[in-house]
Amino acid sequence: MNKRFNSEDKIILAIDGLDVSQAKLLLEECPNIKWVKVGLELFVREGPRVIEILKGLNKKIFLDLKFHDIPNTMRAACSQVSKLGVDIISIHASAGLKALKDSKKASLEGATSVSVKPPLVVGITVLTSFSLKDFQTDLDRNNSIEENVLRLAKLSFDAGLDGCVCSPWEAKMLRSIYKDNFELITPGIRLNIDNKDDQNRIMTPSEAIDNGASKLVIGRSISKAIDPNKALIEIFKSIDSD
């Protein structure tokens, strides 16, 4: 029997760069993984069948497609993906209050129509790939990333969403405002020995949890490790020891 860790519900394994066969092998190597993130690349390549396969492996699924469109389109898209029986879906908070409210309502209605549990709906704030310089230059913004994250998190909360996606840098600020029933999901997680790759606002797993993150999205630190399960267990231990 595998040893259980208190923090197993806090780690979401990102499998976006893998095909289905590779993902299944990785999950066999890492039996303590409860949560899996399916992103745009994997979902476009494999389609809804990847959700069926992961559900067959008894995994909880964060379908991270980051919908961002007019309210009607977002409402229809959220209704459809909610019928797949996933556990969390993501939408861009910058789509606006009406789009967020409509998406949340549609996810409930879509899931209920096929008798599956409605997913949590979380709002994307500012992508972790942005540095402050790039954010202000590329998007022609004069204010800080933190100010924008704060505004978009409030929009998500006011729309009745279940949480938001932010970098671990902003998690402490948001957790001081929003209580534990508001999910703070943080990508941008790296171990001390890792390259930062295309992420900028990053932290280690234990630092992110200490800052108030409720779930951590971790991909390459586990999937590209020489021993993925060993890397995963070290992450669990680092969080559980806090």
Curated annotation (Swiss-Prot):
One of its GO terms (biological process) is 'de novo' pyrimidine nucleobase biosynthetic process. The active site is at K66 (proton donor). Substrate binds at residues 16, 37, 64-73, 128, 190, 199, 219-220. It comes from the Bacteria. One of its GO terms (cellular component) is cytosol. Its EC number is 4.1.1.23. It is an enzyme of class 4 (lyase). The keyword Lyase applies. Pathway: Pyrimidine metabolism; UMP biosynthesis via de novo pathway; UMP from orotate: step 2/2. Keywords: Decarboxylase, Lyase, Pyrimidine biosynthesis. InterPro entries: Aldolase_TIM, OMPdecase, OMPdecase_AS, OMPdecase_bac, OMPdeCOase_dom, RibuloseP-bd_barrel. It catalyses: orotidine 5'-phosphate + H(+) = UMP + CO2. One of its GO terms (molecular function) is orotidine-5'-phosphate decarboxylase activity. SMART domains: OMPdecase. Homodimer. Catalyzes the decarboxylation of orotidine 5'-monophosphate (OMP) to uridine 5'-monophosphate (UMP). Belongs to the OMP decarboxylase family. Type 1 subfamily. This is Orotidine 5'-phosphate decarboxylase. The gene is pyrF.
